[in-house]
């Protein structure tokens, strides 16, 4: 865990002890994050599948995100993401907080207090 925190320091613009790592494929690493950073807050920011896929399609990512340039691949990837998150909820109950984008933008006060 310490090595991850140290190595990601170069990508952060602040020295605060927390940050958000929001790459699209982080969901596959929930178990590892829980093991190496047991106090980490794991937030699953969800959005309507269409909006999520379209947002990924329009974003120019760095290496490793080639699936975002094809809508059919995005649809398959989204389904895999959804199934993987169901798995994490089963094996790590209460460790992942689902935050729904649509609810957050309509009621930020309530949603911001959930965590």
Where are the regions a protein language model picked out?
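PAPS-dependent sulfotransferase catalytic domain
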Residues: 5, 10-114
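Conserved nucleotide-cofactor-binding alpha/beta core module
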Residues: 1-2
């Amino acid at each position: 865990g310490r090595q991850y925190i140290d190595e990601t320091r170069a990508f952060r613009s602040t020295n605060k002890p927390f940050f958000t790592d929001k790459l699209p494929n982080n969901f596959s690493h929930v178990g590892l994050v829980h093991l190496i950073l047991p106090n980490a807050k794991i937030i699953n920011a969800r959005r309507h599948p269409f909006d999520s896929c379209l947002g990924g399609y329009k974003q120019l990512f760095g290496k490793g995100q080639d699936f975002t340039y094809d809508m059919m691949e995005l649809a398959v990837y989204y389904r895999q993401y959804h199934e993987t998150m169901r798995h994490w909820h089963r094996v790590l109950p209460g460790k992942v907080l689902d935050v729904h984008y649509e609810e957050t933008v309509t009621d930020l006060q309530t949603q911001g207090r959930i965590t």
